[in-house]
Every structure is written in C-alpha cells, then in structure tokens.
C-alpha cells in the first residue's frame, strides 16, 4: 500500500512539473484577408494547417478548436 501511495505522489509531482515547465510554445492564429481565421475540420495534426502556416512563414501548425494554430507565428506575420 505504501508503494502505491509513493508511486502516486511521484506521478503527481512529475505531472505538475511537466505542466509548469511544459512546452508552452508561443504562436498565433493565422488570418486570411479581412481578418478571418483559417478553419479546419478535425482537431490535431492537420496537413492543411501545416500548409497554411508555411504560407505565413513558420514550419508547423495544427488544428485547435476547429481553427488553424501556427507555432512561433509572431503578431506581425498573422496576415498574408
């Protein structure tokens, strides 16, 4: 029983450390003309969003809440 409690505490601590120092990558939503966002269908990895993000000058993007999100996209580059 003590091993289970100790294991649980260790897992929780590593989870907290991961959320504190996790990969909180900056980014932005790329915009079309007239400030519309690029929509996408399935959340997660998306070839469409990667292509959109490459048009905006960054290497990687994915679908988040049915909208493309580009990692490391700066505010000045959000519009084409």
Curated annotation (Swiss-Prot):
<feature type="disulfide bond">
    <location>
        <begin position="53"/>
        <end position="70"/>
    </location>
</feature>
<feature type="disulfide bond">
    <location>
        <begin position="40"/>
        <end position="63"/>
    </location>
</feature>
<feature type="disulfide bond">
    <location>
        <begin position="49"/>
        <end position="68"/>
    </location>
</feature>
<keyword id="KW-0528">Neurotoxin</keyword>
<feature type="domain" description="LCN-type CS-alpha/beta">
    <location>
        <begin position="25"/>
        <end position="80"/>
    </location>
</feature>
<protein>
    <recommendedName>
        <fullName>Toxin-like peptide AaF1CA1</fullName>
    </recommendedName>
</protein>
<keyword id="KW-0800">Toxin</keyword>
<dbReference type="GO" id="GO:0005576">
    <property type="term" value="C:extracellular region"/>
</dbReference>
<dbReference type="InterPro" id="IPR044062">
    <property type="entry name" value="LCN-type_CS_alpha_beta_dom"/>
</dbReference>
<dbReference type="InterPro" id="IPR002061">
    <property type="entry name" value="Scorpion_toxinL/defensin"/>
</dbReference>
<dbReference type="Pfam" id="PF00537">
    <property type="entry name" value="Toxin_3"/>
</dbReference>
<feature type="signal peptide">
    <location>
        <begin position="1"/>
        <end position="22"/>
    </location>
</feature>
<keyword id="KW-1015">Disulfide bond</keyword>
<keyword id="KW-0964">Secreted</keyword>
<dbReference type="InterPro" id="IPR036574">
    <property type="entry name" value="Scorpion_toxin-like_sf"/>
</dbReference>
<dbReference type="GO" id="GO:0090729">
    <property type="term" value="F:toxin activity"/>
</dbReference>
<comment type="similarity">
    <text>Belongs to the long (3 C-C) scorpion toxin superfamily.</text>
</comment>
<comment type="function">
    <text>Probable ion channel inhibitor.</text>
</comment>
<keyword id="KW-0732">Signal</keyword>
<dbReference type="GO" id="GO:0019871">
    <property type="term" value="F:sodium channel inhibitor activity"/>
</dbReference>
<dbReference type="GO" id="GO:0008200">
    <property type="term" value="F:ion channel inhibitor activity"/>
</dbReference>
<keyword id="KW-0872">Ion channel impairing toxin</keyword>
